[in-house]
Amino acid sequence: MVKGYDLPKTVDKNTLVVITSISGNTIETLTTLESATKKDCSVIAFSSGGSMESFCTKNNVEFRKIPQIHSPRASFPSYVYSILKTLNSIIPIKKQEIINSLEQLELLSKEISSENLSDKNLSLNLANWITGTPVIYYPWGLNTAAIRFKNSLQENAKTHAIIEDIIESGHNGIVSWERPSDMVPIMIEGKDDHIKTKERWTILRQYFEENNITYKEISSLDGGILSKIMSLIYLLDYATIYYAARLGIDPSPIKSIDFIKERL
């Protein structure tokens, strides 16, 4: 995955490059698109339009238009499933797993909806629990959900957040807890984490408890990796919106991002 301006030097005419930008105007993504085209790569691009659509039309690049829903953040699920459908021949996710993940999301939507403000609403519970700067721990395979949670906290609740790989944290990050701070640990755990990863979760809990550090645990649902990731993202996204509401913050405006975009 490329998040900057440069493609790896190994990319050539035998490489398939998948370009995504929900707005179609992300500067670094457009730069990558232009670079991939110059390298004569096989390219397919996804966006709601913008400069990306114009470039693809002009340069005869394969393009799929996916409507934007409210904002890029809100459009994420529709983009994931649309891209999976288009690339089903090369992405090894079975149709049944996609169906299962959608069914899980439908069930979860009822549990975390604003129409259910009970203690059974996991998103609301998490939002009410956060009191400082979240430090989000995640295992291998669920890093996508952790990154999305961090990004959504920053955009929706205008709150700083940190992510920590559970294994890597045992080599460095754990030491940071030796000093008092407003950090609050949130542990995103996978139902089928490796047995040694589960051992690390147990040790981390023990460390927090012995040092009187309050923590929160969020477990993935059962099922395939797509169900796990999409359900976690849905649950955690809702938590950031509830948290923003609790802080009296409107999740929609992103003035700081606009500040940067206007100067690029």
Give residue ranges: language-model regions.
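Conserved active-site and cofactor/substrate-binding residues in soluble primary-metabolism enzymes
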Residues: 74, 78, 96, 100, ...
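Conserved beta-strand elements of the Class I
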Residues: 16-18, 135, 186
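A short, glycine/Asx- and small/polar-enriched loop/turn
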Residues: 11-15, 131, 233
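Active-site phosphate/pyrophosphate-binding segments
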Residues: 88-183, 262-264
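A short, charged, Gly/Pro-tolerant segment at domain boundaries
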Residues: 253-264
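C-terminal active-site/capping subdomain that shapes the small-molecule cofactor and substrate pocket
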Residues: 175-255
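Glycine-rich phosphate-binding loops that contact phosphosugars or nucleotide phosphates
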Residues: 1-108, 190-195, 199-214
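A generic structural motif
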Residues: 1-5, 159-170, 214-223
